Amino acid sequence: MQTLIKQIRSHLNMSQTELAEHLNVTFATVNRWENDRAIPNKLAQTRLYEICKEGAVPVYDLTLSKIKKTAESISLPAGRVLLYHGSKSGVEGKIEPKSRPQCDFGKGFYMGTEASQAITLICDYDKSKLYIVSVDLTDLDVVEVPADIEWAMLVAYHRGRMEKINGTPFYEKYRDLAKNKDLVIGSIANDRMFYVIDNFFIGNITDAALVGSLSALQLGKQYVAVTQKGCDAVKIETEIELSYLERLFMKEVAEENRAKGVSLAGEICRNYRREGLFFDEILDKARNGGA
């Protein structure tokens, strides 16, 4: 965290003594922080957060820049893809496909192309960890789901939204989409998209509106290892330390993005109105023998 504190001082144009006065600590304390001999406690980091907010210090951007720099320093052999994984309590032991079954693509080990997305999922947890990982795709059976209604329906299946049409060919199509596959690749339901897709499932927007938002948001991709073979192809390259201060800023951005999702959903409703089908209409059509 010593680098971040130096960057904060630089943005605020403060000396160590001046920062110490603002934080109500000693010069020696700030000096120890910047020389990595001590870490600010939560109270000090909360005060740092307030000072950074007042001084418009771009801590969120500084954090992403740190992560990007670390990622760029990693050299990978051919066939491996660099990704990010956020964990609420850290990865211990063997990597396994053991997330909640109700996640977007079911039970698996989730990785993504966007560091910011991985962080927003874990920023509320004190013991959370961010990892830069890689996965070797060479010998894996992979299915990539397009960023359209196919993606939404696969998510609907895994979130238990299709149970009323269980037994239909439509249901079985999505149940079996990743059958015998080691890895599923598809769009990430980020903070903004999460709200939009929920509005689709509860019947506030149509499939046309959903697909329109998928296109407009240009989402990153998630790679999900759904078998042990897939998980065995994953390697943790490094762990990125995230301070309480950084997580406070990440939490703020996540909340802002959720608010943008609410606004986006409203705009989509206005733009598409009755174009397309609502989720329940799609299920009713499937139950009655339609595709």
What kind of feature is each model-predicted range?
Residues M1, S10-H11, Y49, S75, ...:
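Beta-strand-enriched accessory nucleic-acid recognition/scaffold domains that flank the catalytic cores
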Residues Y49, P58-D104, C123, G276-A291:
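ADP-ribose/NAD+-binding catalytic cleft of ART/PARP-like enzymes
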Residues I8, N41-D61:
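DNA major-groove recognition helix of helix-turn-helix/homeodomain DNA-binding modules
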Residues N24-P40:
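Recognition helix of helix-turn-helix/homeodomain-like DNA-binding domains
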Residues L4-L19:
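Short basic helix-loop element that most often maps to the first helix and adjoining turn
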Residues K66-I67, R80, P97-K107, T113-R175:
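ADP-ribosyltransferase catalytic core
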Residues D139-A291:
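Active-site and NAD+-binding cores of ADP-ribose-processing enzymes
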